[in-house]
Amino acid sequence: MAASTSELPSTVATVAAATVENLRFSGTDYIVFTLMLSASAGIGVYFGFFSKSKNTTEEYLQGGKKMPTWPVAISLVSSQLSGVAMMSIPAESYTFGFNIVFTVMAMIPTVPVLIYIIVPVFYENNVSNCYEYLEMRFNKLTRQLVTITFIMNQFLMLPVYMFVPSLAFSQVTGINIHLINTVVSSVCVFYTMLGGIKAVVWTDVVQGGVMLLSVVLVAILGTSHTGGLSKVLENASEGGRLDFNFGIDPRLRVTFWSGIFSGLLMWTGKVGLDQSCVQRIVSLPSYTHAKKSLLIAGIGFLFIMIFTCFIGIIMFSYYYGCDPIQAGLVSKPDKLMPFFIQDIMGHLIGMPGVFISCVFSASLSSLSASLNSFAGVVYFDYIKPHIRHTDARANGIMKLVIIVMGAYCILGGYMVQNFNSIIQTMWTITGINTGAVVGVFLLGMFVPRCSAKVAVTGIIFSVVAMLWIIINAQINFKAGLIRYDVLPNGLDQCEARDFQVILNSINGNTTTPAPTMEAPPQVTTAFGSNRDFSLYDISFYWYKVLGAILVFAWAVPMSYVWPTDKEEKQNPKLYSPFVRNMLNVPDPVVEMEEMPLKSSDLKAKENGTSQDA
């Protein structure tokens, strides 16, 4: 291990020797946290009871399509920075190194993809629901199939969003995790249900400010306590945390290539093709506002997320040679962040409360946006076709859907507590269908000859194939054929006497195993493999990319088996601007820069009939 880390003002040992009370919230911390929740609830009450806006469905879901640029941009950033990001990404950097930053850097190519390829299609077709585009381009079955995958993802992921910050709160307060989860989820459901999209966006602005303040303060204070930036980089380099991996083996846990390509697919899917974000993008007055908002959001996202990734490096450098996980003071990496905060900031009045507010702000912003869009999708795709629609009835039903889903999130916490690696679990779950969803949208925009039958079967083929691959990968994990051992740290630099006594006691009761002549096991690790190549061994970072590739691998040849009807007139506005010159129809003359989205009522009048008939 490296040289002495005498610069550390405190060590794991001093924390271990501290009383339980020293690792708990102070009264000031509780006040800070309560103020954050109260501000969020207050915004919901304002837009629910005192705002002068019309009580229409369009107002509830899209803010009357008059939302301002900067708040929407901040809201887009906030909703991408879930509590999982705040807790698990630093843990990922701490245990596996800084390569996770490549997934963050993928936002750089994602923004122009959204601005010039995807969002123009939505605005030119006056789409208020991104899944509406699939019905226009293919058929209603394609739309319903993709909305089912959206609903499945929400059921799987929403409990995770709230459980992770509850874990952090429990770590520093000792309060039961499920009690915290119940209280905070209820607050989120309350303001989302009352205030609609305006409450979601403006609470995201408040919560985004809390997140920015917290992340910057943690990075600055952590660097200062470690001995400066040069010491952070020195320790991280010696510990292998700054060894960037450019290998092309897809079995490696995360590399430059898997980070960039999977990140590009993930951010394109989450920001540009997921209704929770598209709903806010199309709530802006025009395409020009949407471009500005996406550009601002991209810059803000990169700033906060790079800081978040680097906090993991700071934590490693701070605990270099004195790992609290190995010492048994932290049960798993996902709990390390709040422990670190208490260690370096516990003596600063209110600062632990600010950080926990940051983690909850991140989760609340993700949960509120998802609940609002989930209610809209469920109502318009599955309830509205079967009832007599009125704005009052629609708003009432959507509020009820939000309440039911909030209750499910609370109960889902009992399942999430059994997950080992939160970030790996999330990437694995979303890997089942995210690639298929992104793939079918890109098919619609880039492959004019692709028919509805090809699109539907392509989605099914991709999802079934990915499910098969992921199930077999989990079997390999259980069998020990895939094992993601973390990068090494140690306990040899712990200098405090109390901790050394514990360490000596452990060593005194440990025997050295007899040497064995057995060959090393055939296993795939995070950093290499001595097994024959198997598709089941590929890193979970590649799942989204593989899912999209499978859609195209099926759709391109099958588009010659089931071609589009030659008599069917192709609408060039349904395709990306980059492929319209391939069509045998003139390019539409559209002044898009200042073109607002039409309201649903206006579209209904133009069509002469309701689409849900």
Give residue spans per PLM region:
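Membrane-embedded helix-loop-helix hairpins and adjacent transmembrane boundary segments
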Residues: 1-613
